[in-house]
Amino acid sequence: IIKPSSEKSIFDLNKKKIVSIFKKKGVIIFKGFKINKSNVTKFTDIFTKQYANDAIRRNNRFKDKNLHDVDPGNYEMPLHSEASYSTSWPEIVWFYCNKAPKKSGQTTLCDGRAIYKNFNLDLKNFFLKNQILYDIIIPFKANKANPKIIKRTKNLRPWHIEYPGIYDCYINLKNNYLKYKLKKYALVKTRESDKVAFVNHLQIILNRDPQVLNMTLENNKKISKKIMDEIKKISNELTV
C-alpha cells in the first residue's frame, strides 16, 4: 500500500521506484491520494504502453475510451485472470473506485505462483501436461450477438487470427461476432520472477461470462470434480 507522505500529488511519485515495487510485489494499492476521475488515465499512462481492448458489453466511464465499467450485479465472481482466453490478455490491470461502497465491493487478489506452489506433484504434472480447450465468442460491435444466434452456423465465414492456440475460427458479419477455439495451458512462466503460475479462467461459472461458451481438456473431457475441488480449496486459502 502506497500512501501520500506529504502534500505532493500522485503524479510526483518516483516512477522507477513504483515499477521496482510492482515487479517485486505484483500488486500496489494507491490509497489516500487526491486524484480526480478525469485524471485517472493521465496517471495510468505513465506506466502503460498500450491498453488492451475491453469487452464490448462494458460501457465507457467519464468520457474516457480507456476507462470501463466492471460488470454490474450481485453475482458471485470466482477467481480468474482478466481476459486470459483472448488475444487482449493484459499484463497489468488497473482498478479505480470513484465512490467506494460502505459494504462489500472489494476486488479479490491471489498470487498464481502461490497456487501452483501449493499443488501436490500429481496436480502440477496434470497441468504441465494438459492444455485447456476454450470455446469462445467475441462480439466486436455494440449490437452484441444474441445467445440464440450463437449456436447457429448460418452466416459464419472462415476467419483467421494469428495467435498461437486459436483454431476453428469463424466470423459473423451480420451479427458482429467472432467464434473460435483456443488451446492453452492453465500455467504460465512469469516474466519477472521466472516462476510457474496458475493463471486461467477454470474457476468461472459458465453462462456468467457471456464470452466463454465452454471449457474442457484438449481431449474434450471435463476436468474431474476432485481436481476442481482441490484447485478451489487452495485458491480460497490464498485469496485476499
Model-found features: residue ranges?
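N-terminal non-catalytic cap/leader segment that marks the start of a structured domain
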Residues: I1-A83
